[in-house]
Amino acid sequence: MTSAPEESDDRGEHDAPEQHDEHDALEEHDEPVPVGRQTDLGFAKLMPDIDRDGGWLLTLDGTPQSYVDLADPTHLEFEYTRRLGHLADALAPAGRPLDVLHLGGGALTLPRYLAATRPGSRQRVVEVDGPLLALVEEHLPWRGPGADVSATVGDARAALAAIPAGSQDLVIADVFHGSRTPAHLTSVEFLRLAASALRPGGCYAANLADGPPLAFARAQAATVRAVFPYVCLVAEASVLRGRRYGNVLLAGSTAPLPEAELARLFAGDIFPARLVAGEDLASLVGRTAPVADAEATDSPPPPDGAFSVG
């Protein structure tokens, strides 16, 4: 889970810092303190938000991955989580439980949100980094009354292939190795697995990141359109205009998406974004071809300084 910073305000392979065991026990302190631990994919750190009681930021090798508020799981800090939250809100009447598969766990921000806003939802989380998942469960536990959330360690695509057909209302792909989406989660073949897992009218959603000239985002939009008849792309206007690197949300379904409601929610958010669908999306995609496994590549790396924590 990676969020590109707004102008208004499974992770890296480089050498990880040394483990700091002295920070690896919150319960030893009256006040929350940072927790650091080496994981399979990098050095993970949980840092308390000094400005918000209960708020925690998860980083991996310095790249922001997730933000959770233990006191209020409905608080979504990052713009991409807010957009995914709006999408989930609009897919069904308020409070109706959903069956959701989360590919990519991070600190389980969205599973916590859906457990709070749609009690009774059955949610499965798949995270490739086992030590990271253990760190989050140890210090930011997500289990509680009404929270039917199971988390397992594994590869997102392999887990998706094992999901019973027609069993999910929503499949969310939010997988980053460092700051890049792995190639095997960007192809038509992968999208077909997601489509198979969904119930009729179910929705697939992916959090991605791209920058000028948006070649990756266009190719991913073409790929989703090759599998789903109804597709929308959501991003900040400056990202769509090719002015900067940022997060891109893609959603696809076999049923019409609530585009008008979604457009209103995205435009009115504290991080305003534009929804592109229909002919506008076709124009954006142009002649870009869908991506197959044979030519799939990781998403482009962010520019220097795009993801950083001081």
Model-found features: residue ranges?
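Short polybasic amphipathic segments
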Residues: 56-60
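Alpha-helical subdomain
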Residues: 185, 210-217, 223, 238, ...
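The AdoMet/dcAdoMet-binding core of the Class I SAM-like
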Residues: 37, 52, 71-196, 215, ...
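C-terminal substrate-binding/active-site "lid" region of AdoMet-derived donor-dependent transferases
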Residues: 3, 189-259
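SAM/dcSAM-binding transferase cores
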Residues: 2-14, 21-50, 65-71, 241-310
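A short, flexible beta-alpha/helix-coil linker loop
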Residues: 63-67, 176-179, 204, 211
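Short Gly/aromatic-enriched secondary-structure transition segments
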Residues: 61-62, 74
